[in-house]
C-alpha cells in the first residue's frame, strides 16, 4: 500500500511539472496598429487628441476633456498619417506622403473636422517643420525643397491663408535655422567642409545672414534661446573650457557676456526655457548627483 502511494505521488508530481503549452499568437498581433496612440493635449488644456485606426489606417481623433465622445477629424484610407501636432487651440496640423514616396506634405484641419487645408501639397516636394512658433497662433516656419530638390529653404507659413513667404535662400550648406521670440528668422547653422560648423546671424529679416563664428569638431556653440528683448542669446558652449557651460552671448559676435552656469565635472545635457514666460527655468547634466538646477 505504501509503495502504491509513493508511485501515485510521483505520478502527480510529474503531471504538475509538465510545462503548459501557451497558445500561439496570431501573426497580426505583432503588426497591427495599436488601438490608440500619440496622445496630445491642446494648448488650452480643454481637449486631447490621439491616433486610432479607421478603415485600417491611423487617423486623428479629438475629444473634449470630461466627455466620452470623440470626433474623427481625418479620413485617410490609403496611408497612415506620419504624425501630427496642435497648431493652436482650435487647429491641428499633420504630415502625410503619397503612395509611400516619403515626400511628406503639411495639412491642417480644425478640431471639429472642418476647414481642411493642404498647405504644401506639391508633387515631388518634401516639407519639414523648422519652428511651430507655439506663441504665434497663425504662423509657423517650415522648410521645403520646391526651389531645389537637394536643398530646403525656410518659409513663413500663414495658417489662415496658406500663404508662404520665402525667408532666406539656403546656399546648400545650412542644416538648421533659429528664430527669435517674434518669429523672425535670425540664425543659420551651416556645415563647412563636412567637419566645421558655422553660425550665421542677422539683426533683421531685411538683411542676409553673415558668418560670425566657425568652430571645429572639438568645439561647440549652440544658441538655446534669445533673451526676452531678442538682443542677446543664452548659449551652451565649451569654447575656452573643458566642459560645456551656459552663458549669455552677443549673437552678432559670439562674445561671451556672462557665465550663467558651469560644472567642472559634467557637460550640460539640456537647457530648460519657458517660451510662455520668456525665461530660463534650469539646466540639466548627467552624473551621480544630477539634479535639475536653476541658473
Task: For each feature predicted by the language model, list its residue ranges.
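Peripheral, non-catalytic segments that deliver or gate enzyme domains
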Residues: 31-37, 43, 55-60, 75-82, ...
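C-terminal motif of bacterial Sec signal peptides marking the signal peptidase cleavage site
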Residues: 15-16
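Sec-dependent N-terminal signal peptides
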Residues: 6-10
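A short helix->beta-strand "capping" segment at the edge of beta-propeller domains
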Residues: 20-36, 67-70
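Positively charged n-region of N-terminal signal peptides that target proteins for export
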Residues: 1-4
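Short Gly/aromatic-enriched secondary-structure transition segments
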Residues: 63-64
Amino acid at each position: 500500500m505504501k509503495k502504491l502511494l509513493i508511485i501515485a505521488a510521483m505520478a502527480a508530481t510529474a503531471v504538475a511539472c509538465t510545462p503548459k503549452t501557451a497558445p500561439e499568437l496570431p501573426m497580426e498581433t505583432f503588426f497591427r496598429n495599436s488601438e490608440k496612440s500619440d496622445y496630445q493635449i491642446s494648448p488650452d488644456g480643454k481637449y486631447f487628441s490621439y491616433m486610432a485606426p479607421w478603415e485600417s489606417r491611423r487617423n486623428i481623433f479629438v475629444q473634449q476633456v470630461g466627455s466620452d465622445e470623440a470626433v474623427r477629424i481625418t479620413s485617410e484610407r490609403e496611408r497612415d498619417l506620419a504624425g501630427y501636432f496642435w497648431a493652436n487651440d482650435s487647429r491641428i496640423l499633420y504630415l502625410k506622403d503619397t503612395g509611400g514616396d516619403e515626400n511628406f506634405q503639411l495639412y491642417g484641419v480644425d478640431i471639429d473636422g472642418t476647414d481642411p487645408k493642404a498647405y504644401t501639397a506639391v508633387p515631388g516636394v518634401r516639407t519639414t517643420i523648422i519652428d511651430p512658433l507655439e506663441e504665434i497662433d497663425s504662423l509657423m516656419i517650415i522648410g521645403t525643397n520646391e526651389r531645389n530638390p537637394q536643398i530646403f529653404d525656410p518659409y513663413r507659413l500663414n495658417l489662415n491663408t496658406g500663404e508662404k513667404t520665402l525667408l532666406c535662400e539656403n546656399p546648400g550648406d545650412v542644416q538648421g535655422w533659429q528664430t527669435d521670440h517674434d518669429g523672425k528668422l535670425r540664425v543659420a547653422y551651416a556645415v563647412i567642409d563636412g567637419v566645421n560648423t558655422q553660425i550665421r546671424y542677422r539683426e533683421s529679416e531685411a538683411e542676409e545672414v553673415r558668418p560670425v563664428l566657425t568652430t571645429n569638431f572639438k568645439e561647440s556653440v549652440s544658441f538655446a534661446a534669445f533673451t526676452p528683448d531678442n538682443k542677446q542669446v543664452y548659449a551652451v558652449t565649451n569654447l575656452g573650457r573643458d566642459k560645456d557651460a551656459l552663458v549669455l552671448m552677443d549673437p552678432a559676435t559670439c562674445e561671451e557676456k556672462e557665465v550663467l552656469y558651469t560644472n567642472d565635472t559634467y557637460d550640460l545635457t539640456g537647457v530648460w526655457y519657458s517660451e510662455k514666460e520668456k525665461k530660463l527655468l534650469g539646466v540639466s547634466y548627467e552624473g551621480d548627483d544630477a539634479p535639475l538646477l536653476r541658473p
